Swiss-Prot record:
The chain crosses the membrane at residues 4-21. Part of a complex composed of FtsB, FtsL and FtsQ. This is Cell division protein FtsB. Its main location: membrane. GO terms for cellular component: cell division site; cell septum; plasma membrane. It comes from Salmonella arizonae (strain ATCC BAA-731 / CDC346-86 / RSK2980).
Length: 103
């Protein structure tokens, strides 16, 4: 009975060593699991960005309103006979806003 017990104990030690330190053991599983979580977070950010870009493409393909809005905001374009007014905040309000942004 002693040899069987010794054999089973040796088998148990070998299995535990393989589980903890061997190839595809607990340490490898933990590392791969961390990599998967990080990749899923990156994928979620990229999916949100892609969804935003697809929505913008749909807006631009959908009609003239989106193109007109983009031209007005980004290029400061106006229609013929239209006057463009830019409202500039007071210097004190600009200083307050700059102070809040620096915090």
């Amino acid at each position: 009975m002693g040899k069987l017990t010794l054999l089973l104990l040796a088998l148990l030690v070998w299995l535990q060593y393989s589980l903890w330190f061997g190839k595809n053991g607990i340490h490898d599983y933990s590392r791969v699991n961390d990599d998967v979580v990080a990749q899923q977070a990156t994928n979620a950010k990229l999916k949100a960005r892609n969804d935003q870009l697809f929505a913008e493409i749909d807006d631009l393909n959908g009609g003239q309103e989106a193109i007109e809005e983009r031209a007005r905001n980004e290029l400061s374009m106006t229609k013929p006979g239209e006057t463009f007014y830019r409202l500039v905040p007071d210097a004190s309000k600009r200083a307050q806003t700059a102070g809040q942004n620096n915090r």
